[in-house]
Design a protein with these regions (language model features):
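Adenylate-forming
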Residues: 4-9, 17-23, 30-198
Length: 198
């Protein structure tokens, strides 16, 4: 199957430099750091991505993969990304949040220039999203990756691009204003990059 081929011999750990040794068991402690881009910079990034037949998501993921390669010294970069899991018509009328996790594995070997890297990321992301019906939990069961209490299986880094409405959402007498996510001091992964797009 496509996922088994894509994730064959996936490295068990993306070792990032930290100021402390990895504990024997994950503690799930973490924090959020907020940064924002102005509208002009965002527009230039979208334009750059479009000029290379890519999306903003693909462009930012390629840049993130490159950063992870530089910090880890590895060419095989494995990142998770959440996706809305409502591909089946039967789920459309149900209330609730259905989320699946896709694994995006990018080969940065051969020192590709950024255009070539973006092309690789585009191909990987397009294929992964085309195969998003496979539940991540089932993939882990089938792949049987080496398990450890010290890390998440398959990937330890998450990437997410979230659409953030610029205007309040109105629902009758209730108004929802976009804002920052709450920092609960918890992290499921070693590193998560969430980009809010307005």
């Amino acid at each position: 199957d496509w996922w088994q081929e894509q994730l064959a011999d996936v490295p068990p750990l993306l070792e990032l430099p930290t100021d402390f040794a990895r504990p024997a068991e994950r503690r799930f402690r973490g924090a959020w750091i907020w940064r924002s881009l102005d509208g002009e910079a965002s527009a230039r990034l979208r334009q750059f991505a479009g000029s290379r037949q890519a999306t903003l998501y693909m462009l930012l993921l390629a840049a993130f993969d490159l950063l992870l390669q530089r910090y880890s010294g590895r060419d095989d970069i494995v990142v998770g990304t959440p996706v809305s899991a409502r591909p089946q018509v039967e789920f459309e009328g149900l209330v609730g949040l259905f989320v699946n996790t896709l694994v995006l594995r990018t080969d940065l070997g051969g020192a590709p220039d950024f255009d070539r890297l973006l092309s690789r990321v585009r191909a990987t992301a397009t294929a992964a999203f085309a195969h998003q019906d496979a539940a991540f939990e089932r993939l882990v069961e089938r792949l049987q990756p080496g398990r450890s209490l010290a890390r998440a299986p398959v990937f330890q880094v998450m990437f997410n691009l979230v659409p953030m409405p610029a205007e309040p959402l109105e629902a009758g007498a209730v108004s929802f204003r976009p804002g920052r996510l709450l920092d609960h001091g918890v992290s499921t992964f070693d590193l998560t990059l969430t980009v809010g797009e307005q």
